[in-house]
Amino acid sequence: MRLILISGLSGSGKSVALRALEDSGFYCVDNLPATMLPEAMAMYDDFGYQDIAISVDTRSGPSLGALPQVVEGLKTQGIDVRLLFLEAKPETLVKRFSETRRRHPLSGSGITVEESILLEQEMLADVLELGTRIDTSELSANALRSWVRELVDADGNRLTLIFESFGFKHGVPQDADFVFDARCLPNPYYDPQLRPFTGRDEPIIDFFSGNKAVAEMIADIQAMIAKWLPCYGKENRSYLTVAVGCTGGQHRSVYIIENLARAFSDRQVLVRHRQLYREH
């Protein structure tokens, strides 16, 4: 059996993620107390369900604290358990609650949305350590659905390398394990003819392909990842996220990420271009 747990901050897109899994054929349950997971999984096994997705968050109350032990117990039963932790920048969450006019689940008399977000972050600190983080601050609903499906489709028994480009002007992604800054490299943005393209397009590839500094940065990042990857593999991690940023997240970082992904193509690799997904 396979169990995907969806957790994270309110307003970060957990409902979108759960619906994406439902569309992919998972039997989905929203807001099940952590302590009820073993009993529920035994029942789903009797029913013949193989792919289960369940959201577990602060609505579970005190039982949330038992989640780490519950997850370990399910794994010892041979269940493939993975947890996706969705989050976003506080200012993004505040804006989302304002736009939707929804009430934060932890808000009450005298507690602001900002304070509710901080409280929820504290309550979920231990849960965050259990899973793969997805920063949805700059993601559209369609992009989030796509990312969730890709993560779930990856082989959970192998370490997945996630290569992610981003723009510093939009903020550093919170879900990155490594962050590299490519803003020191030549920027094709200042050439009006190159500006409309991205790092995946031939004109930008030609622009960078003969540049020594660009080649050296790619080689250095590649060497560092190759050196330390076995160490991270020993931690029984499912995912390792390597992020490269430039100013806007359109040219330099995209080009470098594409090259790194090709360099590690013999491994399980996922590619994300955070700013290219913003409008899709």
UniProtKB/Swiss-Prot annotation:
Annotated GTP binding sites: 57-60
Cystine pairings recorded for this chain: none
GO molecular function: ATP binding; GTP binding
Binding positions for ATP per the UniProt entry: 8-15
Signal peptide: none
Pfam family, one: RapZ-like_N
Keywords: ATP-binding, GTP-binding, Nucleotide-binding
Coiled-coil residues: none
InterPro entries documented for this protein: P-loop_NTPase, RapZ-like, RapZ-like_N, RapZ_C
Keyword Chaperone attached: no
Family of this protein: Belongs to the RapZ-like family.
Function: Displays ATPase and GTPase activities.
Name under which the protein is recorded: Nucleotide-binding protein CV_3336
